[in-house]
Design a protein with these regions (language model features):
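Bacterial N-terminal signal peptides that target proteins for export
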Residues: 1-10
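Compositionally biased intrinsically disordered regions enriched in Thr/Gly
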Residues: 23-295
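Compositionally biased amphipathic helical and low-complexity segments enriched in hydrophobic
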Residues: 11-12, 269
Length: 295
């Protein structure tokens, strides 16, 4: 009888424990993110009703979150994505689709305002010739580079042509702390006064990449000046390190394209804050399973 009673008590304790454990599991907030994409591919004639005129090719590929945590969390995450995609805070109060529509509307109005200049330039050309510099292009896209339960890193790429000798291209990175839903900058990672030390680390990394032994030797590789090579806050993060990019004309000529440099966390240890968030984001930096392929 005592044995049966003990068994019954233990079974009851087990059931109660499992019940509350399951409740806790269900209540635990999820950091899983579901994404959707808005794609725009339009050819905008300089005048609305004249397809014989120059036009602007406009292409957007906007990846944005549609499911994440609570409704408030999702709204905040979408706000960050919208604001960083269009690089203007006037859009971050809009839904992703509203922001795309508004940006496109403003771009079309700005492009078509050039029509009077087009006819003025055309009148100065030999008959039958067209001012081809009014053929414009605009491409904006983003892609997810890294994601785990605490961190989301992504890139926004811009390329455009507005009639000059060549188009322009730039890539900008953003890192979001998924726990606090804020973007991360160098100041969040490094101790006060980090700037000079980080500059030296970046410089050494570039010297290694370009296989030179002295900073001035980078000038022979095409870099403008050594003084231009400084931290620029344009980095993304994964469990390997920080990945910096310097865009065209930032530290080198257009012909060299964007300059990329990766810095392992081991090299950054002396300037990381004592309570640095790197350890929180990557409790086991050797674990490659938290990485994901770019979207």
């Amino acid at each position: 009888m005592n044995t049966n009673r003990i068994t019954a008590v233990l079974l009851a304790v087990f059931i109660v424990t499992m019940f509350f454990s399951c409740k806790n599991i269900r209540k635990k907030p999820t950091t899983a993110i579901t994404f959707d994409t808005i794609v725009v591919a339009r050819q905008i004639p300089l005048l609305q009703n004249d397809s014989t005129l120059p036009y602007a090719d406009v292409d957007f590929k906007f990846i944005y979150p549609v499911k994440f945590g609570t409704p408030e969390d999702l709204a905040r995450l979408q706000q960050i994505f919208v604001g960083t995609f269009f690089t203007d805070t006037q859009y971050d109060t809009l839904s992703p689709q509203e922001a795309v529509d508004k940006y496109l509307e403003k771009y079309i109005a700005s492009y078509r305002a050039l029509s009077s200049d087009y006819y003025s330039d055309k009148s100065r050309l030999p008959e039958g010739e067209t001012p081809v510099w009014y053929y414009y292009q605009l491409n904006i896209s983003n892609k997810i580079l890294f994601q785990n339960d605490s961190l989301l890193s992504y890139a926004v790429e811009y390329s455009d042509y507005t009639g000059g000798a060549h188009g322009s291209y730039r890539i900008v990175y953003y890192n979001i702390d998924l726990n606090d839903l804020v973007t991360i900058s160098e100041e969040d990672l490094f101790i006060p006064g980090y700037y000079k030390s980080l500059t030296d680390i970046i410089l050494r990394s570039l010297m290694k990449k370009y296989n030179v032994t002295a900073p001035d030797s980078l000038l022979t590789k095409g870099f403008f000046t050594i003084e231009d090579i400084v931290p620029n806050n344009n980095f993304w993060m994964d469990n390997k390190g920080l990945h910096y990019t310097y865009n065209q004309y930032e530290i080198a000529p257009y012909s060299m394209g964007p300059i990329d440099v990766t810095i392992p966390y081991e090299d950054l240890k002396p300037i990381l804050k004592p309570d640095n968030i790197i350890e929180r984001f990557f409790p086991n930096k050797e674990n490659k399973k938290s990485e994901r392929d770019p979207i």
